[in-house]
A protein has these predicted regions:
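ABC ATPase nucleotide-binding domains
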Residues: 33, 72-231
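The feature captures the beta-strand-to-loop junction immediately N-terminal to the Walker
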Residues: 37-39
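Helix-to-loop junction immediately C-terminal to a conserved catalytic motif
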Residues: 52
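Conserved coupling/switch loops of ABC nucleotide-binding domains, chiefly the family-specific signature
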Residues: 58-61, 111, 211, 243
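Conserved ABC transporter NBD signature motif
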Residues: 60-68
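Non-catalytic connector elements of ABC transporters
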Residues: 239, 249-354
Length: 354
């Protein structure tokens, strides 16, 4: 197997008596785009800052391209970083901001001008060279910050929640642009975010973090469809959680309220009488009994919300509530609160949370 480009090995970080990152391990392949996803305070930015050299690990080591960089200063690591707050120099033009690192490195004026022009073309802002940061929108400023980070041709690109200060439409277009540029340059990238949609849409892999540890590392498909822990299942995507009791472990029978479903092969050592947390994504559930769905539960519609192209329906099943979306059809009246209703699903889509 090829050697990883970035290897974070058993890294721990403590501030006094408080440990914020605990035994964090991750290997990143050359050219890979990996997102650190998690809530505030989970340690994702601290790990990024240790890779950048702004924080020193309390234990463990960080290796880039086979070289131990754990104790190197930030300017010795050949790492580009983009901050949430842009951090552009207000007294410098766009071209001067992009070329700043090149000038510090002692590059010749003609080379700087050529590289700056190339960067402006890459971020599609060639006409902005002589403007100042205050004359730019937030999205344009973040593009300039990205261009400045990649202008020196770093080995590794680090992005610390670069889109969180932007409005929704700009965030979507800019994240796609960042991914496109990253693919074009082939630069190994770590992207920190608390936004699951961002992470799912642009990452090769995602490290979901909680309490200073990596709860799960996997592709977006794996993280969403095969969550390893209850935290990952709840944090990524919308989830319906049902409490059930194992009635027959050998045959995989579980009782939800007073109704039974079969989860053969999914109980993982659970015994008859055990209580389980079961979960279904809304898109895995249909209203009414549907062909091809091997499981169903009966309940009563408790809420109906018209959302335009879809109608969000909540169905009470004993002490559980299940949320699902059904397409809006002008020819079919929406379901009504208080109606009895069946929901159907495939048992293969049911998650057992641990």
């Amino acid at each position: 197997m090829a050697e990883p480009f970035l290897s974070i090995q058993h890294v721990r970080k403590s501030f006094g008596a408080t440990t914020v990152v605990e035994d964090f391990n991750l290997d990143v392949e050359p050219g890979e785009f990996v997102s650190f996803l998690g809530p505030s305070g989970c340690g994702k930015t601290t790990v990024l800052r240790m890779v950048a050299g702004f924080e020193e690990p309390s234990a463990g080591k960080i290796v880039v391209a086979g070289k131990d960089i754990t104790r190197l200063k930030p300017n010795q690591r050949n790492v580009g970083m983009v901050f949430q707050a842009y951090a552009l120099f207000p007294n410098l033009t766009v071209a001067q901001n992009i070329g700043f690192g090149l000038k510090v490195a002692g590059m010749a004026r003609a080379e700087i001008d050529s590289r700056v022009a190339e960067m402006l073309d890459i971020i599609k802002l060639p006409q902005m060279a002589d403007r100042y940061p205050y004359q730019l929108s937030g999205g344009q400023q973040q593009r300039i910050a990205l261009a400045r980070a990649i202008a020196p041709k770093p080995k590794l690109l680090l992005l610390d929640e670069p889109l969180s200060a932007l409005d929704a439409k700009v965030r979507v277009s800019l994240r796609e642009e960042i991914r496109s540029i990253q693919k074009k340059l082939g630069i190994t990238t770590i992207f920190v975010t608390h936004d699951q949609e961002e992470a799912l849409s642009i990452s090769d892999r995602i490290a979901v973090m909680y309490g200073g540890k990596a709860e799960q590392v996997g592709t977006p498909f794996e993280i969403y469809n095969r969550p390893a822990t209850k935290f990952v299942a709840n944090f990524v995507g919308t989830l319906n959680v049902l409490e059930g009791t194992v009635t027959d472990a050998a045959s995989g029978k579980v009782r939800v309220n007073t109704q039974e479903v079969s989860l053969m092969g999914k109980l993982n050592g659970s015994k008859s009488g055990d209580t389980l947390s079961l979960a279904l994504r809304p898109e895995a559930i249909s209203l009414g009994r549907q062909p091809g769905r091997d499981s169903s539960l009966s309940g009563e519609i408790s809420e109906v919300h018209f959302l335009g192209s879809v109608i969000r329906v909540r169905v009470g099943i004993g002490g559980n509530t299940v949320s699902l979306d059904t397409f809006n059809s002008p020819a079919t009246p929406p379901p009504a609160v208080g109606e009895k209703a069946d929901i159907s699903f495939s048992s293969s889509d049911m998650l057992v949370l641990h």
